[in-house]
Amino acid sequence: MSTDIAIKVDADHLRRDAFLYVRQSSLRQVFENTESTKRQYALRDRAVALGWPIERVHVIDSDLGLSGAQSQDRDGFQHLVSEVAMGHAGIVLGLEVSRLARNNADWHRLLELAALSRTLIMDEDGVYDPAYFNDRMLLGLKGTMSEAELHILKSRLQGGILNKARRGELEMPLPIGLVYTPDARVVLDPDRQIQDTVRLLFDTFRQTGSACAVVRRLRGEKILFPRRIRRGIGKGDVLWNEIDHSRVLQILHNPRYAGAFAYGRTRTAYNAKLKPVQLRVARSDWQVLIPDAHDGYISWAEYERNQAALEQNATGFSPGLRGRMPRQGSGLLQGRLLCGRCGARMRVHYEPFEGRLRPYYVCNEAVVRHAGKHCQWVRGAPVDEAVSALLLEVMAPAAIDVALAVQQEITQRVEQAAALRGTQLQRARYEAELARRRYLKVDPDNRLVADALEADWNARLRDLDALQREHERQNEADHSLLDEPAQQRIRALTADFPRIWNDERTGAVERKRMLGLLIEDVTLLVDDEVNINIRWRGGRTQSLSVARPRPMSVIRKTPAQVVALINELLEATNDRQIAARLNELGHRNWRGEPFTPKKVMLVRRTYGLKSRYERLREGGMLTGEEVAQQLGVCESTVHQLGRKGTLKRHRYASNHRYLYEPPGNVRLEKGAGSRYGGRQPRLIVAQPLQQGAS
C-alpha cells in the first residue's frame, strides 16, 4: 500500500538527497497566507524522520509567488526536474500535488522521470513510488484533480467577472481623461488641462482625418500629452510628454472615450517562446459592448466614423482598403481610384523622369494576389489635369464657404493651442512655486535634503523658463496666421481660387484634402480613350473622357512635316543652316527645345536622309584632293583658288569644308599667281595634243 513507508524507503533512496519544493501562487498569498508556507517548510521534519540528515534536505523555494499552471519561468521546478532526471533525488516532498504542478503535462513528465530514476514522492498523505502502477495511478488522479480544481476556480472567477461586465459595473483601468468617482461612476477627469488636451486630439483628428497628422500638429505646436502611471513608484501620478503615433491610435480605437463600456477587446495567447501576448479581437466578437454607458469625449456615431476613417487610411492589400489619407506625391487621385475593369483599388506608382517623379495609376491586384499581369495602367498627369479642371469649375460657387471654413479652422486651432500652452505654463508656475516652498521649509543645516530640494527648484525654474520662451515664440507664429495679410490671403479664395489651386506653394497634400471634400471616388477605364467616372459626395456622378496618353516612342517621334522640310533644305544647305531655318519657322523638338546641328544630324540619320555631302557627291562635286590631281597642283592651291572664286565650291559642313565643281577641260596657267606678285591665277582651256606622223 502507498502508506507502507518502511517498505518503500530503502538504503538506495537514503543514499541520495531529499528535495522539498515550496510554492505559493502569488505574492499576496506569500504575505497573507503565511500558515500555508509554514506547513510546507515543516515537511523537512518528515524527511528527517524518514532517515535523511537535515543537511541533505534541500529546500527549493525560488518559485514563491509564481503560478503552477505551467513550468515556464519556474526556475525552481525546472531545477527539481533536472535533479530527478539525473538521479540525485531520493525523494521529492510537497505539501500537496498542487504545490508541484497544476498542469498535467508538467506533472506526468515529473512522474515519468521519477519512475525511471526510482525517486519517491511524498505529500501530506503519504509516500508514493511512481515505479508502482497503483501509486502512479493515484498520483495521476491527484494531478488531474489539481488541474481540475484550478479550472473550476478560474471558471468561477471568470463567470463572476463576465456577469458583472454584462451589467457594465466591472471596474477596469480607465484611459487618461476618465476617472472613477467614489461611488464607482465613470466621469471626465476633473483636471481641466487633461480634458482640453484629450478634446484637442479628437478635434485635430476630426479636421485632418489622420493619426499621423495629429502627431505632426501636436508635436509642431509643442503640445504635451498626459500619461498616468499604472504601477510601481509614483502610481497614479500624471506625466506630460510628447505624443507618438501608437498612443494616438490607442486613444482613437478606445471606445471608452465614446462613453461605451467594452469587455473582451483582447485575448491572451502564447507565442513560440510560450510567452503570453495580448491579441486584438474584432468588434463583432467582443463579449460585452454597452454604448452610452457613461460620459465621453465624442459620440458613438463619431467613434464609428473615426474607425472607418482609420481603416480607409490603411495602405495594405486587404480587400476594401484604399489608403485615402493624403500623402506626399503628385498623384492627385491617390486612394480614390477604382479600376473600371475588375473593380479593385488602383494604386499610384512613381517613376523618375527628368529629375522628378511622374505618377502612373496602376491596377496591380492580379500581380499581387495571383502573380498575373497588370489589369490596366495610365499616366497620371492627363487624368489629374482633367479632374482638376472639373473641380475648379465646380468649386467656383463654393469658394466663399471654403474661405470661411479655412478662416474658422485656423482661428479655432490657434485658440485651442494657445489655451493649452497657457495651462501648461500655469502648471509649470505652480510646480516651481511648490518646489520653492519645499526648499524654504527645510532645515538649512540638513544640507543633504536642502541640496536635493534646491536642485529640484532649479530644475522647475528651468522648465518654466523654457515653456515661457516657447509660449512666446508660438504666440508670435500664431499672430502671423491671424494678421491682416493672412486674412487677405484667405479672403482671396473667394475671388481667385484657381490661382491658389495652381500655385506652386500649394502642396500636393493640401490639394488632395480639398479634392477629398468633394469627390468620393473616381473610376478609370482605359480604352481608346481614358474614361473617367467621378462620384461626388452625396452620390451624384459625372463622366468625362481624355485622350489616351501617347507612348513615348510616338511622343519622341519628329513630325513628318519637319522631316520633309529637312529633306528639302538638305538640297541647298547644311545642318547648321537647317537648324537656324527650323528655329526661325518656330519648330521645336519633342521636349520643346530649339533645334541644333546635332539634333538635325540625329533626325537625318534616324530617317536615312542623305547628307549634304552625299547629295553634292551624287551631283558630281569633287573634293579638293581630286581637283588638285586633275589640275596638277597641290591641294592648298585648290583651296586658294576656291577662296578667290576661281574655282566654284559648295559648303557641306559647318567647319569650312567644301566640295568643288569639276573644272572641266582646263589647266592652270603657269607663272600666274606667284606668291610675290605677278598676274592673278587663271584657268585656260587646255589645247588638244597634236598627233604625230606614223
From Swiss-Prot:
It is found in: Membrane. Residues 175-316 bind DNA. The chain crosses the membrane at residues 386-406. GO terms for molecular function: DNA binding; DNA strand exchange activity. It is a single-pass membrane protein. Gene3D superfamilies: Putative Large Serine Recombinase, Chain B, Domain 2 (3.90.1750.20), Resolvase, N-terminal catalytic domain (3.40.50.1390). Residues 17-168 form the Resolvase/invertase-type recombinase catalytic domain. One of its GO terms (cellular component) is membrane. The active site is at 25 (o-(5'-phospho-dna)-serine intermediate). Keywords: DNA recombination, DNA-binding, Membrane, Plasmid, Transmembrane, Transmembrane helix. SMART domains: Resolvase. This is Uncharacterized protein y4bA/y4pH. It comes from Sinorhizobium fredii (strain NBRC 101917 / NGR234). The lineage of its organism: Bacteria, Pseudomonadati, Pseudomonadota, Alphaproteobacteria, Hyphomicrobiales.
